[in-house]
């Protein structure tokens, strides 16, 4: 039996993490959660995640810094990252894309749009 793909959701809002978690689990994904970028790096060191979904504006370590750290790390530099954020400005989107974000979803979001983006980026 194939192991479920694991997704790390990083957001300082527990309600956003809950909505994303429920939508992803319904489609068979395992979900790990973190409230900020620093916590996410700790989780990544302990668990093999197939994809990261991250907010941009968070305390301790923001999502763009997290994205840059992920792309620098030899063990997970190829892990796709989706930015899920209220940041809709083109400058921030360009910064995210330049740092390696594979998708940019603006909050408020439809859970199915997030699930579709995850499905496209996780390679079987």
Where are these regions (language model features)?
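His-Asp phosphorelay/catalytic-motif detector in bacterial-type signaling
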Residues: 4, 48-50, 75-80
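Charged docking surfaces used in two-component/phosphorelay signaling
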Residues: 18-26
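Acidic, metal-coordinating helix/loop segments flanking the phosphotransfer/catalytic sites
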Residues: 33-51, 94
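Short, glycine/charged-rich "phosphate-handling" switch motifs in NTP-dependent
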Residues: 102
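C-terminal output helix
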Residues: 109-118
């Amino acid at each position: 039996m194939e192991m479920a793909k694991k997704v790390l959701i990083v957001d300082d809002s527990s309600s956003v993490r809950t909505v994303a978690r429920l939508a992803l689990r319904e489609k068979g994904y395992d979900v790990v959660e973190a409230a900020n970028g620093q916590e996410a790096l700790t989780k990544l060191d302990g668990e093999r995640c197939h994809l990261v979904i991250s907010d941009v504006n968070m305390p301790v370590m923001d999502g763009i810094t997290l994205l840059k750290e992920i792309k620098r790390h030899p063990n997970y530099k190829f892990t796709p990252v989706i930015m899920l954020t209220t940041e809709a400005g083109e400058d921030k989107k360009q910064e995210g894309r330049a740092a390696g974000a594979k998708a940019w979803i603006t909050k408020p979001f439809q859970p199915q749009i997030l699930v579709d983006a995850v499905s496209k980026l996780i390679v079987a």
